Amino acid sequence: MSKQFTLGALAFGAVFGLAAPAAAAGIAVIPGYASLGEVSTTAYHQPSRSPFGMETEPATGDVSSKWHAVEAEIEQEEAVLVNCRSEQACPAAALELLDIVAEGADRAGRARIGLINRAVNLAIIPTSDEAQWGVADHWSPPFETLQTHRGDCEDYAIVKYVALLEAGLSRDDLKIVILRNFAPNQDHAVLAVRLDGEWLILGNNTLALVRDKDMIGAKPIFVLDQDGAHRLIASNRVAASDPLLHRTLQEN
């Protein structure tokens, strides 16, 4: 990238587009959030290992170090959840996370993902890191977010990542993606979930499960998963299907 990525720019309520207006599609949008506009349905790619059909390269710096720190805390919290399931002493935040997981326990596939996405979105009040922590950027592990019931976009994504793992989804099918919105010019974190060969994007500003190929108004920059932090780069397939997206990726 030619510009330094600034984590402090992550927006806690950024809006990304859908292939139809929320109201027309019968989608329930969380009260107080901006409505969603129409977008093109141009597909960027065929199903792939990475969201948006893009290639990746290892990322270093602040993004990588913050993700590794959160991963270490997630590992500790997963051990606590194991104890909770064996009826040992369980902190309130862990019980709340298990309650979120239970929202989708009796369902499968898209229904399970949607119910857990809804439960997380309704459990957390969108709050900037400046307002909550007095710093430009702070990434919280799930228990910390659920203790305060406040967080910004990456905090929602991290809770969803762990909740869906606990619900039985594979780590291979879960990736946190950092996007750069075109308007406003802000960075925004979402969770990408692979289902039946397609990637669904779960944001904190809507209850809709949006296919990656139905999104416009933002470009993907980083992907965070079990393999660490990686920067997304435009592939030849993306360049052929969407020259504008390819050009904007190369410019940043």
Model-predicted segments: where are they?
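Bacterial N-terminal signal peptides
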Residues: 9-17
